[in-house]
């Protein structure tokens, strides 16, 4: 079943409603990280170039559903888009019963989560949204894993439902990385907890040639290998699970390497003193916050030989520079690699920005949870809806 692409449609004079993922951090009314906004611009610009009257909607943050809260208003996003686009951009706060929008203009709807029924994919709300447009464009890969009114229901009731260029690119890149990858396929999975990424680790361990774990996840694997992890964040109840994943990888001729050296401190703080230790020398009072240089070099070598690289999650607490060298080395190795590389997840994108490698990564995914669910092998509800409407 083919998905209809926005780029193939005649949008002249049409009311086009685009669901983007504009969920960006805002501080004192100003957007502090604009990666998702930048990613959405080509879609909005294409709709304008095709002669459409453009409406854009998104969620921002986690407000109480159905209640207006100025802290989660889309106004800072409107201010950003007004500077980035060469046209009128305005905010519509009361839009469900109809909104005036002219060709060549962009109207941004107030936070979709201010609407009661958004998260439950309420049918009445979905139909009201669908009635606002001639063409609905799903372009928010970051929320494609949620069946909500603005990402799923509206598409079922709109006259035409299609994928925007950003979503189409995401699906193509992920397919290239996982469906028919150039091998060896190396996956780097970081983050704080095994429990949140267990299904990802299980799914990937069956298809990758080499699985690398980092961050708090690695601590559980270090403990599973019989080493002391001191006061580090780890999950004792998942040690057997970690052992099983390692055994599975080894039975396929791969491995999940455990760091040989680590960077530790006595407290979690931006000023904590970093100490390098062999992994078997971690004391009861230590907390592991990064991999050491030997481990980082070993991982860099694995990355150098890869044909395809999937990166989701840092290997240390890179927000603090003294615990960022491991992630920095991984980032450099990915940047230097000739392999097809795809990076996704909020913390990963922050690392890509910090180490300035965005132009060296083949594809940067805007999705967090959606990226993970795709890695788990699940069909995303928004994609299922688009396939249904394209049939």
Curated annotation (Swiss-Prot):
Give the subcellular location. Answer: Cytoplasm
| Sequence positions that bind ATP | 197, 319, 345-348
Q: Does the keyword Cytoplasm apply?
A: yes
* Broad enzyme group: transferase
Gene Ontology biological-process annotations: gluconeogenesis; glycolytic process
Pathway of action: Carbohydrate degradation; glycolysis; pyruvate from D-glyceraldehyde 3-phosphate: step 2/5
**GO cellular component terms attached to this protein's record:** cytosol
- Does the UniProt entry include the keyword Kinase? yes
Per UniProt, the keywords (alphabetical) are: ATP-binding, Cytoplasm, Glycolysis, Kinase, Nucleotide-binding, Transferase
Query: Principal place where this protein is found?
Result: cytoplasm
Query: Which Pfam family is an annotated match for this chain, by its short name?
Result: PGK
What are this entry's molecular-function GO terms? ADP binding; ATP binding; phosphoglycerate kinase activity
Catalytic activity of the protein: (2R)-3-phosphoglycerate + ATP = (2R)-3-phospho-glyceroyl phosphate + ADP
Entry EC number(s): 2.7.2.3
Listed under subunit, the entry gives:
Monomer.
Q: Which PANTHER family match?
A: PHOSPHOGLYCERATE KINASE (PTHR11406), PHOSPHOGLYCERATE KINASE 1, CHLOROPLASTIC-RELATED (PTHR11406:SF23)
> To which protein family does this belong?
Belongs to the phosphoglycerate kinase family.
**What protein name does the entry list?**
Phosphoglycerate kinase
Organism expressing this protein natively: Shewanella sp. (strain MR-4)
